[in-house]
Regions:
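Solvent-exposed loop/turn segments connecting transmembrane beta-strands
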Residues: 214-222, 241-252, 279-286, 333, ...
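Transmembrane beta-barrel architecture of outer-membrane proteins
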Residues: 221, 250-252, 274-278, 285-291, ...
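Repeated loop/turn-to-beta-strand initiation elements of outer-membrane beta-barrel proteins
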Residues: 179-180, 207-209, 220, 232-239, ...
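Outer-membrane beta-barrel "beta-signal"
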Residues: 227, 340, 513-517, 538-549
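Transmembrane beta-strand segments that form the barrel wall of outer-membrane beta-barrel proteins
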Residues: 153, 186, 206-217, 223-246, ...
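C-terminal outer-membrane beta-barrel translocator/porin domains of Gram-negative envelope proteins
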Residues: 175, 190, 208, 216, ...
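Periplasmic polypeptide-binding modules associated with outer-membrane biogenesis and secretion
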Residues: 1-217, 226, 240-260, 378-381, ...
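Transmembrane beta-barrel wall of Gram-negative outer-membrane proteins
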Residues: 252-333
Length: 549
């Protein structure tokens, strides 16, 4: 364990330019109650280095190394990181393979400049001895099928031996998360110019059972039960059962995922679920049963595309006489068929700076129901995250938006957009947007458009680090607007019957505390609405907790 901690420290500092970092000594002291140890690491950081000049050289005829310059993802002056260099070598090796060039090694040659504390990098293209993969041996997998491990290798018996590809395969095996330890090594074969790849794995428990407790202003108290298996029947498949019960909603889901459908880089997902709500935002109840198969595949190293179909049986009921007529007219059952896709991009897989990340999700659904009813629903989410000031301060930004385009019929309140407290802080759930102010219960109608931007920073407070308390400040701005039917309870043709569905910007500022406790993370937010309308539902305090055991 101490050796592992030393490695973590070394990786942490070297990834931030401290190439001379070393652990000078470690000491262990027994606590007063003799129940634990205090570990002290005496370290020496050394100087921080940055990237200097970058060059390419080649001893191979007919190979122009300068053509690979466009692949560079770092610039002189960036903080040096061996991880960035390794990622750069992988990119160049991938390009070499695309050109069908075998037995070429890319060697990063590093020259240190002590005066300005920079490291000059030369990527040297050299001819490597021709070797081939003789065979791949796998052992230690008592539960997991051989093919689950073997399909992580892009190289098969008889292919040219590529050390980088073998390292990448080992990383993919570890990323499965079903083995406690993975060791991949190579040795010479009896055959000329051939190597044997040995894979030794250590099985670990892959099933889990969890019970959780949650509380938020929106949903009140709630409980969750989750059972999951990440290596179902040793096939590398994922199976889970989730049950969630809240004060005004209950849902149950069964999920199945086959990550290599038909032995291809194609993930097959199956989801079966049911959700019921009881006067969640207005005085009506809903019941939805759905089945959703999907296929996902990578478009690049950083992005995936999911194609999905969903069948849902949806029922809306109400016993209230005070419900808005704009909602009351939508009571009944519908069977909905939906075709859609989800595009997902995450830059953390391939970024120069480990302290920043950009992700994006974009989806569209085309839904068709009975009785001339259909719509197209579009949603997008952009996230950006960065740590500054020696990684002690975190800054994040988020932009979420959506549009409901009704093709046939009138839009329903359950299909329109509403905001939740965690999405638009400073307002209650469905606290902004079009509202039937002429109904007794002041029912929120939702909107066919929504957009919310959030900017947040969290930082350490002047308390001991072991208390695990951080402060946060944030700014939220957004709106929900647009209806294809603005008729309220009084009727569209009567005075006061129209619903205001125009775009009105709302904004809030706030500060809060985040506390990681033994029972789970607690969050306290204090907010003030800067811009709001008279009929909005603001709130000045929000508390949430999530606990698993």
């Amino acid at each position: 364990r101490v050796r592992f901690d030393k490695k973590v420290l070394r990786d942490f500092y070297s990834d931030r330019g401290f190439v001379d970092f070393e652990v000078i000594s470690t000491t262990a002291e027994l606590s007063r109650d003799r129940g634990s140890y205090f570990m002290t690491f005496n370290i020496q950081e050394g100087e921080q280095y940055r990237f200097g000049k970058v060059s390419f050289s080649s001893a191979i005829i007919d190979l122009d190394p300068k053509s690979f310059k466009t692949l560079l993802k770092f610039k002189p002056g960036n903080i040096y990181s061996p991880r960035v260099v390794d990622n750069q070598v992988k990119k160049i090796e991938n390009k070499v393979r695309e050109l069908n060039l075998d037995f070429i090694a890319i060697i990063p040659q590093i020259a240190r400049n002590e005066e300005d504390r920079t490291l000059n990098i030369n990527f040297s293209f050299e001819k490597s001895p021709p070797n081939y993969v003789d065979r791949i041996n796998i052992k230690g997998n008592r539960v997991t099928r051989d093919y689950v491990i073997r399909r992580q290798f892009k190289s098969v018996e008889g292919d040219p031996f590529n050390p980088s590809e073998i390292r990448n395969s080992a990383a993919r095996i570890r990323a499965l998360g079903i083995f406690g330890d993975v060791n991949v090594s190579t040795r010479a074969s009896n055959k000329v110019s051939s190597v044997i790849v040995d894979v030794e794995v250590e099985e670990q428990p892959t099933g889990s059972f969890g019970i959780g407790f949650t509380y938020s202003n929106d949903e009140g108290p709630g409980g969750t039960i989750k059972l999951s298996e990440r290596n179902f029947l040793g096939r590398g498949q994922f199976l889970s059962f989730d049950l969630t019960s809240l004060s005004d909603a209950n849902q149950v889901h069964i999920n199945f995922l086959e990550p290599q459908f038909l032995n291809r880089n194609l993930a097959l997902g199956l989801k079966l679920g049911s959700k019921t709500t009881s006067e969640q935002f207005s005085k009506y109840d809903s019941e939805v049963t759905e089945f959703e198969p999907s296929l996902s595949f990578p478009l690049s190293q950083k992005s995936t595309l999911k194609l999905k179909y969903r069948f849902s049986d949806e029922t809306l009921t109400s016993k209230s006489t005070a419900l808005s007529s704009a909602i009351l007219s939508q009571m009944g059952s519908k069977k909905i068929n939906t075709l859609g896709y989800v595009y997902d991009l995450d830059s953390k897989i391939d970024t120069i700076d480990p302290n920043e990340n950009l992700s994006m999700k974009f989806s569209q659904d085309y839904s068709v129901g009975d009785s001339n009813f259909s719509y197209i629903k579009t949603k997008g989410l952009f996230r950006s995250h960065k740590t500054v000031f020696r990684e002690e301060v975190s800054i994040s930004a988020k932009l979420a938006f959506g549009h409901l385009a009704q093709v046939e019929g009138k839009s329903r309140v359950v299909d329109r957009f509403k905001t939740y407290t965690r999405q638009m802080r400073g307002f209650k759930g469905a606290g902004i947007g079009p509202r039937d102010r002429h109904s007794t219960s002041q029912d929120p109608l939702g909107g066919q458009y929504f957009a919310v931007a959030q900017l947040e920073s969290d930082f350490p407070l002047m308390v001991p680090e072991e208390y695990k308390v951080r402060g946060t400040i944030f700014l939220d701005a957004g709106s929900v607007w647009g209806l294809d039917d603005r008729g309220g309870t009084s009727g569209v043709n009567q005075p006061g019957g129209l619903v205001d569905d125009k775009f009105h910007l709302r904004s809030t500022v706030g500060a809060g505390l985040m506390w990681r406790t033994p029972i789970g993370p607690l969050r306290f937010d204090f907010t003030k609405a800067i811009k709001k309308l008279s009929y909005d539902k603001p709130e000045s305090f929000n508390f949430s907790i999530s606990s698993k055991f």
